[in-house]
Regions:
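N-terminal secretory signal peptides that target proteins for export/translocation
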Residues: 1-11
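Bacterial N-terminal signal peptides
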Residues: 14-27
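Short, glycine-/small- and polar/acidic-enriched structural segments
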Residues: 32-178, 182-188, 200-211
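Periplasmic-binding protein-like
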Residues: 40, 109-119, 197-227, 231, ...
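Ligand-binding clefts/hinges and TM-proximal coupling segments of bilobed small-molecule sensing domains
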Residues: 142-157, 161, 237-270, 311-313, ...
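Short helix- or helix-capping micro-motifs
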Residues: 194
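Secondary-structure end/capping motifs
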Residues: 226-305
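Conserved C-terminal helix/tail region of periplasmic/extracytoplasmic solute-binding proteins
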Residues: 295-332
Length: 332
């Protein structure tokens, strides 16, 4: 029997279903990830928290699609606004800030000098470096600034040696082995490779117990103001990555293999253990570490004489995460 009412109801069902679907969809949060670029300045293990955040899927989990790039101009690209975040040393970002730029460190990985001064076998003591060639990453880099900070402790200045821009750690190791340089500052665990090649550890900077802000997560004050939620989510990913470093060797080592471009399990494990032992669960940057950097820079940059170390750090977002109990909850 034909029933007009039934036909009308049937026609209305798809419309009703579509309306309900639209209401549900409109109520769902947007999962479109923020697309950003992030720089890291070296392939040393203390840069690895960023790598673990990527490989561990933590950035995308927090709504961030990041293109992570290795560049020797990490601070320049950050200051220019070409990237939103950078993994770099306190000395690298401090030089830019002292010259009027606005970078700030929002999380710290390393707060003491740990490099080894590695030399060819014929060099037996620090005094033997006089007149010799020492390789650094590039002028103004962490390896350069740390070297000129340490040399005066042993009666040497940068004028007593020839400093050569050689490149990152792999290039410095090759230059050492080939004899084109006589010594170089090498971050652990890569000094072990130098030892295996017959080089001598002339100085372990860790023995000096010098507070010095090494690698950390850096952004700009512009980003903290204009993209604060993005910065909050990025830092959350970073803190979660530290948790993975502490508790998940498998994912962490996968990240090290990818970004250090090696399949050598011994090298991967050495690098991973270095980061695991160095990074703190609550990565507050070191005010004392920045104080050392600024004092050292005062001879080269006039603005350093009146600079306040606290101005180089912004822990407001880290304190939010900490006080909320988020960090402690990761380790329960």
């Amino acid at each position: 029997m034909f029933c007009p009412h039934s036909l009308s109801g049937t026609k209305q069902l798809p419309i009703l279903a579509l309306s309900v679907l639209l209401v549900i969809v409109s109520a769902l949060p947007s999962f479109a990830a923020d697309k950003i670029r992030v720089a890291f300045s070296a392939v040393s293990p203390t840069q690895g928290v960023l790598w673990v955040a990527d490989v561990g899927g933590l950035l995308i989990k927090n709504g961030i699609s990041a293109e992570i790039v290795y560049t020797r101009a990490a601070i320049e690209t950050l200051v220019a606004g070409e990237v939103d975040f950078g993994q770099m040393t306190g000395s690298l970002m401090s030089s830019a800030r002292l010259q009027g730029a606005d970078p700030v460190m929002i999380a710290g990985v390393q707060d003491i000098l740990e490099d080894r001064l590695v030399a060819r076998p014929n060099i037996k003591a620090m005094e033997d470096l006089r007149g010799k060639r020492i390789g650094v990453f590039r002028f103004g880099s962490a390896s350069h600034l740390r070297l000129i900070y340490v040399l005066p402790r042993y009666g040497l200045s940068n004028r007593d040696v020839t400093l050569l821009q050689v490149g990152d750690t792999p290039e410095r190791l090759i230059a050492l082995a080939g004899g084109s340089i006589d010594a170089a500052l090498i971050s652990p665990p890569d000094h072990l490779e130098a030892q295996r090649a017959g080089m001598k550890i002339l100085l372990n900077l860790r023995d000096l117990n010098i507070a010095y802000q090494g690698s950390g997560l850096v952004t700009t004050q512009r980003v903290l103001v204009r993209k604060r939620d993005l910065a909050r989510r990025f830092l959350k990913s970073y803190v979660e990555a530290i948790h993975l470093v502490k508790t998940n060797p498998e994912i962490s080592k996968k990240a090290f293999a990818k970004y250090r471009q090696t399949k050598d399990e011994k090298r991967i494990d050495d690098a991973y253990q270095t980061l695991r032992e160095t990074v703190k669960t609550k990565p507050y940057p070191s005010i004392e570490g920045f104080k050392t950097i600024i004092e050292d820079a005062s001879e080269r940059i006039p603005a350093a004489k009146t600079a306040n170390p606290k101005d180089f750090i912004d822990v407001s977002l880290l304190e939010e995460l900490d006080k909320s109990g988020f960090i402690d909850a990761l380790y329960r």
